[in-house]
Amino acid sequence: LGGSGAGGGDSDAADLVVAEIRDSGGDAIANKASVSDRDGASSIIKDAVDTFGTVDILVNNAGILRDRSFRKMTLDDWDIVMNVHMNGTAYVTHAAWQVMYEKNYGRIVCTSSGSGIWGNFGQANYGAAKTAMVGFMNVLALEGASHNMRINCLAPGAATRMTATVPGRPPIDVDAPPPERAPSLVTPAVLYMCSEDAPTGRIFQAMGGRFSQAAMYTNPGVELGTEASFETFCDNLDTITD
């Protein structure tokens, strides 16, 4: 929440959330650093540890969009989205990982997207970064298992400051979205992934009160042996793709 949807350092949203939490009787701090900066990402975890003593849960949810067809997309459009979504997630998680590993406990949520899992026109940069979350999760789920660290992906759908910038979508008041676009309807899945009973290595989709699990699969395939060739591959294509 420490930055603006345009990639700047506007921290108004973070301050508002902190105020809301404190008004409700909780305790919170805002960190104004960018997740795409290594030192800034590390400072997020350092501030949390300095203030609260440790880190039990990390939800990687920083985001930015630069939507346009790949033909019209600049490499700067590509880099800024990758730096925030992919590198930012890695940087913050790397800092938190050390704390969680030593204490033998941690819950991590990475924000993926249907734009990466299923594809969405004009979002090659965003879709690639969001699919990277799945590969990142798969490896860390293995590496963290022996230390009670569980990591999952969320593929959410809701009205936010970021989605309000998507070209072609009707304007929505993100402070008072339609009920079916309320971010609060994503919350149950996030709470589950942060709980004691959280699984690991799963992708949960959540939008408008509808929840599902997405997964990659492999079929039985066919064994062509050491004599495999283009011809035998094509001859067995029906079985390979069944």
Residue ranges of each PLM-predicted region?
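Substrate-binding pocket helix/loop in short-chain dehydrogenase/reductase
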Residues: 69-70, 77-79
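Active-site helix of classical SDR
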Residues: 93, 129
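Residue(s) in the substrate-gating loop at a strand-loop-helix junction
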Residues: 113
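C-terminal helical subdomain
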Residues: 173-242
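The beta1-alpha1 cofactor-binding region of Rossmann-like NAD(H)/NADP(H)-dependent oxidoreductases
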Residues: 11, 15, 32-46, 75
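A glycine-rich helix->loop->beta "capping" turn
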Residues: 24-27, 47-60, 66-69, 105, ...
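Active-site-adjacent segment of SDR/Rossmann-fold oxidoreductases
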Residues: 99-102, 118, 134, 139-149, ...
